[in-house]
Each structure stands twice: as structure tokens, then as C-alpha cells.
């Protein structure tokens, strides 16, 4: 089954890009191809001048691209600090003392998470666990941070809080971020541009440049510029949802 077709998008270094579209349109497939988890049947993917994936090039995951998935992936038997230190120690790119210093610095700068450094994941709220996972991803100093609907299961208040934490992390690290979401409000509020995809096979329907200044604040959600961009994105999504419905497609997670 063809998941994606003619998907061409250029992402600048340090840019925050959100990808939205109907369920089953290939958003997560695209992210997995960038990550090096899925095979590319046609076309290619580059980061800077490096070829990451192509039809003749086997998938190649690497520390330059780190994924934070929908479901939690912290090691329950390790403390927060041990979880964050895990990547560089496993790859033997930092000594234990260097890894500890870097981990504590990241935790401190990302919402004072150093206060729970010796806690275990089960002792943290779901929102705090998500923040630790993002810090652990940043610990590997990736060029690209890939976020696959990380806040999907959260209530509105928790999600709003996480948005502010993520925006602060982005301000501090200035990494390139690819963010998959179903939530148009979330996509526009967080990103520099929003890629709207069609129904399966997923193609890029439109790319919306977000005309909101940084730093982002919740009051922007009621601004005229925001509401215009949300309407534009929603129209594209609704058109694709109608096409899927008329073809009798069943929603896929």
C-alpha cells in the first residue's frame, strides 16, 4: 500500500515544523522515514549534505535524529538522572562525570527538573515524564528532534503547560524540530510553519507560514492572525476528511 506520494518539503536548520493531516495520511510514516526506521521506496531524504534515505540506500537511524514517541519510553528502573545520561554513556561519547554534569544542566534549564533528578518515572506526573523524555532526547545533541504526537493523551491544562515548556526548551536549544500532531491549535501555536497533508496516499496539500512572533504566549490564540491561519488549515483538513469519507475509508490511528 502506498503511504506517501510526491512529498517534498524543505526544512531550515533550527526551524520548528508541524505536520498535520487526517488520520492514516502518513504523518508518522514520514517521521519514521526521517528517523531511519522505515524504508524509502522512491525519492530521498537529506540532512544538510548527508543522504539519510533513498530507494537504493538502506534506512540508517542515527544519533543526529532522535524520536520522542506518543507512548512513554523512560526506563522505569532508572532514576530521572540515569535515564537522561543513558544515551551518551551507552554510546561512550561522554564520561560518567561529563554526562552527569550535562544532564543536570539540561534538567535545570528545562523547568527546574533537576529537583526530581533522583526520582523514578513512576513518581512523576505524565507531563513531567514527557519533559524528561524530551530532555533525554536533547542530551544526545541531535540535529533534528522528531516528536510524534507527544502530548496526545494529555488533558487541556496539562497540554497547555507542556506547550510552554517545549517552547522554552526550543528557545534554549534551537534544534530543528519536526512535530506530528492532529491538533491544529497546537501546530500553529508551536511551529514556524505547518505542513498540511492530504488523505492517503499522503501528499502535501499546503504549507502555512506561521505569522506569529516569538516568544509565543497563550494570548496569541485569540489574535486575528492566529484565527485566520487556523481557518486556512482547518479548511484543508476538512476537505481531505470529506474525500476519505466519500471513499469509505476507515479512520486509522
Where are these regions (language model features)?
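Catalytic Walker B motif of ABC-type/P-loop ATPase nucleotide-binding domains
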Residues: 145-148
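Conserved ABC ATPase "signature" region
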Residues: 51, 96-115, 168
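Conserved signature/switch motifs of ABC ATPase nucleotide-binding domains
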Residues: 122, 140
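Helix-to-loop junction immediately C-terminal to a conserved catalytic motif
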Residues: 35
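Hydrophobic anchor residue at the start of the ABC signature
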Residues: 134
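Short helical segment in ABC ATPase nucleotide-binding domains corresponding to the A-loop/adjacent helical element
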Residues: 81-90, 100, 104, 209
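ABC ATPase NBD coupling module
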Residues: 51-69, 90, 96-97, 219-222
Amino acid at each position: 500500500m502506498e503511504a506517501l506520494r510526491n512529498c517534498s518539503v524543505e526544512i531550515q536548520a533550527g526551524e520548528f515544523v508541524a505536520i498535520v493531516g487526517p488520520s492514516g495520511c502518513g504523518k508518522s510514516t514520514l517521521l519514521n522515514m526521517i528517523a531511519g526506521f522505515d524504508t524509502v521506496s522512491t525519492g530521498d531524504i537529506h540532512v544538510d549534505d548527508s543522504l539519510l534515505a533513498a530507494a537504493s540506500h538502506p534506512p540508517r537511524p542515527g544519533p543526529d535524529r532522535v524520536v520522542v514517541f506518543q507512548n512513554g519510553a523512560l526506563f522505569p528502573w532508572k532514576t530521572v538522572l540515569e535515564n537522561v545520561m543513558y544515551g551518551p554513556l551507552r554510546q561512550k561519547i561522554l564520561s560518567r562525570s561529563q554526562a552527569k554534569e550535562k544532564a543536570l544542566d539540561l534538567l535545570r534549564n528545562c523547568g527546574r527538573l533537576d529537583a526530581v533528578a533522583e526520582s523514578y518515572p513512576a513518581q512523576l506526573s505524565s507531563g513531567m515524564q514527557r519533559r524528561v523524555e524530551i530532555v533525554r532526547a536533547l542530551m544526545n545533541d541531535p540535529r533534528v528532534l522528531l516528536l510524534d504526537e507527544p502530548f496526545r493523551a494529555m488533558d487541556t491544562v496539562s497540554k497547555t503547560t507542556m506547550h510552554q515548556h517545549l517552547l522554552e526548551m526550543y528557545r534554549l536549544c534551537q534544534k530543528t524540530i519536526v512535530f506530528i500532531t492532529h491538533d491544529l491549535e497546537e501546530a500553529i501555536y508551536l511551529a514556524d510553519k505547518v505542513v498540511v497533508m492530504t488523505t492517503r496516499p499522503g501528499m502535501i496539500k499546503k504549507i502555512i507560514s506561521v505569522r506569529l512572533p516569538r516568544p509565543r504566549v497563550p494570548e496569541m490564540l485569540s489574535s486575528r492572525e492566529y484565527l485566520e491561519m487556523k481557518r486556512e488549515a482547518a479548511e484543508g483538513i476538512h476537505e481531505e476528511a470529506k474525500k476519505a469519507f466519500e471513499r469509505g475509508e476507515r479512520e486509522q490511528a
